[in-house]
């Protein structure tokens, strides 16, 4: 009988949640491929399915559980042999999850994902241990195997793990631990490798970009790791065309940082800056270490020096104790500030967080009303903002055919991040995926722009 080895075993990934979790999936895929596994695109083609879960909010947890159960059904039908549960949900609930999901074969926390090849190999050889939990202290190095799951012209670049903030609504520190920053040298080395592989756009991700390097400098004040120094170093990477920053905390956006972004031809003028609220009392309850005045100062700093900047933010409505008056202050603030993009979440109480233990929780009907009211205000703003682009020519990176029809190409201009923002639909002109082209904008929709490629003689 032929002995099965890693060289003829197939694995499929289901990666849920944020881009930071996706990078962990990419590292697991790279590690397994290096060990001889084949990564396949469909679950029923695989021997093993790894569900990299999200445990951040209630909806994410439900989705993770459902996908695990779906894969368990495939296993019961004999279509796959093994179900591995990895990621944040596993790390957060540990033994409770193991007890509640006997159908799964292995449980790998976010502190052990880097050992996935060894864990799978030992399991295949008959080892009985099925739980692998540890503190999430792992930071990838330049040589860490990784498979870029994005279109070849873009990639996520994770610069740190964990978070030093303690927002009352957030479970991330419980799951991912305290801030651990990678060195600038390691980040730049990975950036160069990605660019050498064809990447034109790097999307910089962490739990808070503006805290980058604080942990390193606290241990050794002579070290240079800081947001500004990292930006300067990445700006020197040859062949890189766009650098996109995600998850900026408002009080960390300094004038020096804004000037570095202003002076760069690579760092796109795009600020992803979750504010969560604007009322001072609600911010205090959320344990957000800022005031409305400080938020407005940060916004003024950006707009004064970069009037063309695209600002994306997100808010939480229905946090415990939020009054109608406090919500209306937020609503008026959104109308006044005219943000380019806004995401809105209904507060979800999380176990073992200060917010989850608070009294005066808001009922679901009120949360839904506030969510819908805020998004209605923002939809009108977004439509107006997009109309301002009509008649302008924008640099666009081509992503492929439209999701709606193969008759249109689809791309993004520098003010659109993948997956969370709209797109540019191109109805005239030809280009290849990954091409940077100039597009003349002829029309707009609520979240998307429409245009035609400018042919340069």
Curated annotation (Swiss-Prot):
Catalytic activity line of the entry: L-aspartate(89)-[ribosomal protein uS12]-hydrogen + (sulfur carrier)-SH + AH2 + 2 S-adenosyl-L-methionine = 3-methylsulfanyl-L-aspartate(89)-[ribosomal protein uS12]-hydrogen + (sulfur carrier)-H + 5'-deoxyadenosine + L-methionine + A + S-adenosyl-L-homocysteine + 2 H(+)
Pfam families with a match to the protein in the record: Radical_SAM, TRAM_2, UPF0004
Cofactor(s) it depends on: [4Fe-4S] cluster
Organism whose genome encodes this protein: Bdellovibrio bacteriovorus (strain ATCC 15356 / DSM 50701 / NCIMB 9529 / HD100)
Name used for this protein in its record: Ribosomal protein uS12 methylthiotransferase RimO
Alphabetical UniProt keywords: 4Fe-4S, Cytoplasm, Iron, Iron-sulfur, Metal-binding, S-adenosyl-L-methionine, Transferase
GO cellular component: cytosol
InterPro entries named in the record: Elp3/MiaA/NifB-like_rSAM (IPR006638), Methylthiotransferase (IPR005839), Methylthiotransferase_CS (IPR020612), Methylthiotransferase_N (IPR013848), Methylthiotransferase_N_sf (IPR038135), NA-bd_OB-fold (IPR012340), Ribosomal_uS12_MeSTrfase_RimO (IPR005840), rSAM (IPR007197)
Subcellular location: Cytoplasm
Function: Catalyzes the methylthiolation of an aspartic acid residue of ribosomal protein uS12.
NCBIfam families per the UniProt record, alphabetical: 30S ribosomal protein S12 methylthiotransferase RimO, MiaB/RimO family radical SAM methylthiotransferase
Main localization category: cytoplasm
Cofactor info, note text: Binds 2 [4Fe-4S] clusters. One cluster is coordinated with 3 cysteines and an exchangeable S-adenosyl-L-methionine.
Radical SAM core domain boundaries: 149-384
Ranges for domain TRAM: 387-455
EC number: 2.8.4.4
